[in-house]
Amino acid sequence: MKKIFRWVALGAMAFTSVFTARADEGMWLPSLIENRIADMHEKGFRLSAEDIYSINQASLKDAVVLFGRGCTGELISPEGLLLTNHHCGYGQIQQHSSVEHDYLRDGFWAMSRSEELPNKGLTVSFLERMEDVTPIILKGYTSDMTEDERVALVKKNSAALIEEAVKDGNGLRAKVEALYYGNQYFLFLYREYSDIRLVGAPPSSIGKFGGDTDNWMWPRHTGDFSIFRIYADKDNNPAAYSLDNVPYKPKKYFHISAKGVQEGDFTFIYGFNCMAVCNLNPLDILPIISQKIAFKYISSICLDTNGEEVSN
């Protein structure tokens, strides 16, 4: 039996480590991982908290990117190669497909850099830093304010903070996220690159094998990947698409190992999660129990009944 620890940042990053024994879960932001590092070391983790998240040196946060607005990507070469899921690059693969060149059906591989395909509107964002800005966002709040007044204050203070955070430009993008039902606010500062080119993708029969049904319902046997490359200007800064751009030089990238893992190895996933509902209160859980679970049960009965009718 394996022991699973899960760190999830709402709108930010997620970790998962696997070890032996019982299940155990929790939620932590990468910037707060120092609070968990001793426990991780006891279970076989060999890196420091600074190796995971640091604003002073290259760390894992510099090799894990936000692909588009909802996917995770990983830098896997010193020349800006980026690995992400097949479904994350699906839209770009489709846009480049035609009757003559059906890349969704047949796959695509650029044999040279000149064959790599640009993708208008696609961005890749590197997290520069995250910080707790709760006192700044709630400055001016009083207990006698209405909820509408509180929302307006948060919006005003967030806009001012974001404007200040990105004033240096050069691809900076900032976002203020509310955590724990608005009891805590974090500023996330990203550096965003927009010259992202498709390098390779397997046929959908491999990359999307089993479709969404297998994705959500069953263990998967899928080559779920696509490969892109980030391009930058000659100074490694974000730049609009140009033939003069050069492959991005990452601060850190992952080395792919073909050795695999052994039973009980400490493993660890770091990425941008779509959503998290680990801190639901009882009032939020009740509709799930009374409606969603009941609906699934009724649906399963209907499916079983249809199966019997077909067999008869």
Residue ranges and their predicted role:
Residues 2-5, 11, 19-312:
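Terminal presequence/propeptide segments associated with secretion/organelle targeting
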